[in-house]
């Protein structure tokens, strides 16, 4: 066998640059995130909104967000644990609860932007 040089010496560790924290934790794929949040350059500083849905064991979280340099800004949010206030008592993590939570988010977003009168939704049952 020939001579094997030690690669991880003091100079190696002195110049080593760690990855971003969320990359080290395995939470963020920055390549996919870049493709998701970058707006077209001909749209001139217009935010690119996206809907984020997280399903936990006991809740469903829906959010509308857009990316800024300082971090993502949440415009509006709705949670499945708020649904009992509107009459949905059980099953807060199933398909129907996800639909209701998204509907609640949409109504809140329309109210926030003042478009609730334009898009009234279903009024007759």
Curated annotation (Swiss-Prot):
The keyword Cell membrane does not apply. The keyword Ribosomal protein applies. Pfam families: Ribosomal_L5e. Keywords: Acetylation, Cytoplasm, Nucleus, Ribonucleoprotein, Ribosomal protein, RNA-binding, rRNA-binding. One of its GO terms (cellular component) is cytoplasm. One of its GO terms (biological process) is translation. One of its GO terms (molecular function) is 5S rRNA binding. It is found in: Cytoplasm; Nucleus, Nucleolus. The modification N6-acetyllysine is found at residues 5, 48. The modification N-acetylglycine is found at residue 2. CDD domains: Ribosomal_L18_L5e (cd00432). Belongs to the universal ribosomal protein uL18 family. Component of the large ribosomal subunit (LSU). Part of the 5S RNP complex, which is a LSU subcomplex composed of the 5S RNA, RPL5 and RPL11. Component of a hexameric 5S RNP precursor complex, composed of 5S RNA, RRS1, RPF2/BXDC1, RPL5, RPL11 and HEATR3; this complex acts as a precursor for ribosome assembly. Interacts with NVL in an ATP-dependent manner. Interacts with RRP1B. Interacts with IPO5, IPO7 and KPNB1; these interactions may be involved in RPL5 nuclear import for the assembly of ribosomal subunits. Interacts with RRP1B. Component of the ribosome, a large ribonucleoprotein complex responsible for the synthesis of proteins in the cell. The small ribosomal subunit (SSU) binds messenger RNAs (mRNAs) and translates the encoded message by selecting cognate aminoacyl-transfer RNA (tRNA) molecules. The large subunit (LSU) contains the ribosomal catalytic site termed the peptidyl transferase center (PTC), which catalyzes the formation of peptide bonds, thereby polymerizing the amino acids delivered by tRNAs into a polypeptide chain. This is Large ribosomal subunit protein uL18. It comes from Sus scrofa (Pig).
């Amino acid at each position: 066998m020939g001579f094997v040089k030690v690669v991880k010496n003091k100079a190696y560790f002195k110049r080593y640059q760690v990855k971003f924290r969320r990359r080290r934790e395995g939470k963020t794929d920055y390549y996919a995130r870049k493709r998701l949040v970058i707006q077209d350059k001909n749209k001139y500083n217009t935010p690119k909104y996206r809907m984020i849905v997280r399903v936990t064991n006991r809740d469903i979280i829906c959010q509308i967000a857009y990316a800024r340099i300082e971090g993502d800004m949440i415009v509006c949010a709705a949670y499945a644990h708020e649904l009992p206030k509107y009459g949905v008592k059980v099953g807060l993590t199933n398909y129907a609860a996800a639909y209701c939570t998204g509907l609640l988010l949409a109504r809140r977003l329309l109210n926030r932007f003042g478009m609730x009168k334009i898009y009234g939704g279903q009024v007759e049952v």
